[in-house]
A protein has these predicted regions:
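N-terminal lobe of the biotin/lipoate ligase/transferase fold
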Residues: 1-156
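A short, compositionally biased micro-patch
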Residues: 48, 119, 165, 284-285
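A short coil-to-beta-strand element that immediately follows conserved catalytic motifs
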Residues: 98, 160-165
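Conserved active-site carboxylates
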Residues: 169
Length: 314
């Protein structure tokens, strides 16, 4: 499957005879595998008599690293969830840091139990497993630091109008382009393992399970994007951001994060499990908590199942 897909990833026509010879199988076997692509991966294969087969459009396949990278990276053809896989490996004693990237996810998930749409070869589904030895102090603001790193990686590709929504959504033009999900095992007050899940909409053009305005790097750039280039930028930004966070805490990133905060000074509604809180967004504190002006008094909010939305049109 993987070899055939790589052969077709250039978007050009390939005859069944050519593909069969390269794979060492019959033309009918090639046909069956292509049917499997369409059935199992939702990919469109064009068939033209006398020319052969090609994918509806080229695919940007993740290539093996040309260098060592900041940590080991395992690229998987298909996985239920990169977060779930990293948590399994951490529980089995894998040595952190390490990362897992899936070409597709069959059970991708986001914050608050939401499904994360994960078509094959379209986006980045990436999870970094790390060990945190600084306890709660190191965990404070970590998701915001990761969001900032993701925003800067997207900016590195020339994307404009990139902004952040507390706590960790990345938006372009007011539409979601990336999200972060942190899950941990162990004692958060002492030593624990953290799975830092990152999903970035890269080349996706159609989605059926996204219940909010969204966009992709391809949509805003006007053409297909090399996912390898974005992956390299992401890992570089992540390595720098997490190192700074470990050494200096969230305070070192606070000003830069607020400079990208789209709702700074806006009237917002913060939804909690118990109620809705309306106030003006003042920014974030040195722990990454959201600062709101509520009924003339400043309040701070962090952790738990919190959701923020605009409540004004200014």
């Amino acid at each position: 499957m993987q070899t055939l897909l790589k052969l077709l990833s250039d978007g050009r026509f390939h005859s069944g005879e050519e593909l069969g010879a390269l794979l060492g199988v019959s033309r009918s076997a090639v046909w069956k595998r292509l049917e499997g692509f369409e059935r199992d991966y939702g990919m469109v294969v064009q068939r033209v008599r006398g020319r052969g087969y090609r994918l509806e459009e080229p695919l940007s396949i993740i290539s093996p690293r040309s260098d060592s990278g900041p940590w080991p990276l395992d690229v998987l053809f298909s996985i239920d969830s990169t977060n779930a896989e990293v948590l399994r490996r951490l529980s089995a004693g894998a040595v952190a840091p390490f990362a897992v990237l899936g070409e597709r996810q069959t059970a991708g998930r986001g914050r608050r139990g939401r499904q994360w749409e994960s078509p094959f070869g379209s986006n980045l589904y990436y999870t970094l497993g790390i060990t945190v030895r600084g306890g709660a102090q190191e965990l404070e603001g970590m998701s915001l630091v990761v969001g900032l790193a993701v925003a800067k990686a997207i900016q590195a590709l020339g994307v404009k109008d990139v902004g952040l929504k507390w706590p960790n959504d990345v938006l372009v033009g007011g539409k979601k382009i990336a999200g972060i999900l942190l899950e941990l095992t162990g004692d958060p007050a002492d030593i624990c393992s953290v799975a830092i899940g990152i999903g970035i909409n890269v080349n996706m053009r159609t989605a059926y399970a996204i219940d909010q305005p969204w966009t992709s790097v391809r949509e805003v750039q006007g053409g297909q994007v090399d996912r390898n280039e974005l992956l390299q930028a992401l890992e570089s930004q992540l390595a720098h951001a997490l190192s700074r966070h470990r050494e200096r805490g969230f305070a070192a990133s606070r000003e830069e994060w607020e400079s990208l905060h789209l709702w700074q000074g806006r009237q917002v509604t913060l939804s909690t499990v118990a109620n809705n809180i309306v106030g003006r967004a003042l920014g974030i504190d040195e722990r990454g908590a959201l600062r709101l002006l509520v009924d003339g008094k400043e309040q701070s909010y962090s952790g738990g199942e919190l959701s923020l939305r605009l409540s004004d049109d200014s």
